[in-house]
Curated annotation (Swiss-Prot):
Compositional bias of kind Basic and acidic residues: 354-365, 397-407
InterPro entries: DUF3654, UPF0329
Start and end residues of each stretch annotated as Disordered: 354-438
Family: Belongs to the UPF0329 family.
Pfam family, one: DUF3654
Organism: Encephalitozoon cuniculi (strain GB-M1)
Coiled coil: none
Residue ranges with Acidic residues bias: 408-417
Name recorded for this polypeptide: UPF0329 protein ECU07_1850/ECU10_0050
Amino acid sequence: MMRTWMVYVVGLVGELYGSQVEETREMREMKEALERLFSRRLSDSEIEMVESLEDGGNFETRVLVPVIFHKDKVVVSPAARYRDIEKEERVYVEEVIRRLRSLVWHSMVYIYVPKNNDWIMDLICEVLEMSSPQRLDDVALYKDTGGKCGMKFVDLVNKMFKQNADMLIKFGDLLSNGAETRILELPDSLREDERRREVEMLQRVKEYGKMLCTEDKQKEIVEAQKIMCDACEQIWRREEDRKEFTMEIYSRYLNMKVMRGGVERDVEDPLIDHMDHYMLISTHKKYKCMDVVAELVRKVFVEDKDIEDSDVMSAVCSVRERKRLEEMREMEERKRKEEERAKNEEELLRMVEREEREKREESKGRGKKKRGNRGAGESKEESKGRGKRKRGNKGAGESKEEDRGEEGGVEAEDPLEEMAVGEAWRKKKGSGEKRISEEHHYKVHSRVLRWKKDAGEIKRELDEGYEKKWKNRSIEEIKEQKKVHDIVEVMKLLRDKEKCDRFFVRTGKYMKGKSERWKMVANGILEEGGEKKVGKVEVGLFKGEGGESVVYHLMFRPTETERTGRVGGSSFGKYDDVDEIKKEKSSDMFGFRYPSGVRCEMTSNRNEFRIEYRNRKNTSEVLRTLTILRIPET
């Protein structure tokens, strides 16, 4: 899990600092850049990972994510055609498309090789300049409808991969020969161990170049990208999957922006992600089911991890369970329709029987003996009178039915005055009455509320508590943890259903510790002392004994702890590191106030919810700021 993140970050560092530096200085600057990004010193395991990249390089396979972002929204989805793009975004998209072929080429051939990156990068650019197919106008290609509806974005990406594949033989041959030349040119002054490492590294480059010349490798690169495009298109069809996927893309763009010191780029290229081609292709061949592949891609992408056999099986199980639930819902819907149809048929039968009975009674009345002329006249007049009276009564009856219908309409609106919807309620919007937004109701577990207290009291509670992972922590550690856990003001955002749905994604439910649990996740930025950390705001919930939703976990998880797996794994994963939740006191937070002198200001708009934590002795001093960002528009 950690490796993909570190490779990704090393790529960013290379972008910032370039590769034309000595190894020792390169290593030092890389570590310093990472520590600035993380706002802390690197751990031993992280330093070891950076050093392993320097020692072994990176030859991992990659795929391109077929999505174009502009600021905080998706402007081109996998299946988008040019005509689908908003007019005000088309100039931006066209600029991205012009750069896309170069990005595709780099994703196909780029490798990270310490002390050799200069000539390899020059070679990548040189081959692209020499061999790019006839300087194709990719924008015109994407815009061209050819009398039809035009090509999808994934079709454009796949076409570029196929066209660029023709350049792999030339690049592979030059790369292999270049590595061989450098082996022969190694200076005699090198120590034996240094020479051995250099030869081993260049030998790997040489073998990689030869492999690119093979038809099998060329097919693998193109096929893996085709599967990735199909998977992303499938992900886009399910709203919950699409939200998670775009949130993770947005999170990575935010990280790159922080890495650049907050500098906005004129154009953000689509992301390149490390993904095992062999596992991707073999899963597709084995299951022949794009639902399984899409679930696998979604899982490893949002959890930022390498594909493992367990991930494949998890994807298979998730798809099977989803289909089982869909079949159950379809069966219930069919059953409901059948019952409704039977009920309608029964009602229709009763109506027919009633009409036939009325006809028989009417027929009997006409069969009575006729009276004399006078009697007939009187009968006729009486009949007319009765007819008038009858029609008059009928009109009255109709009027009553209409009145009842109007009354029914009023009654249908009455429940809106205060309607319970699961765990939500709303009030009817009346004339001159301010609309009250629908609310969620939660209880907050004491393990969340403890972080409101001072560090010393928190430490005493944790040392005496039942959660082993929190025992014997230093005061310094507790203070650091308080910064990311003492964010109970987020509950204000959670309670407002409309806002909550705009900022938070709900993950699937899972069972742990005899309780049904689930999460809500949002992108966020924590700022303190001029340093910014990108991460996820996590809310962990379970069902209480009374059926209420109880918040047992609330924190801001910085990206580096999520990706290194140091605290509970991915925010989107269907698991957590809380083994047991004791039946302790929970609060609905009604009337909650911090101690006197502490001030916390909250502001919000459609795009962000901002919490400023201030110094209790000097409220003009902002200690830290948590900004929660809305789910990107798709």
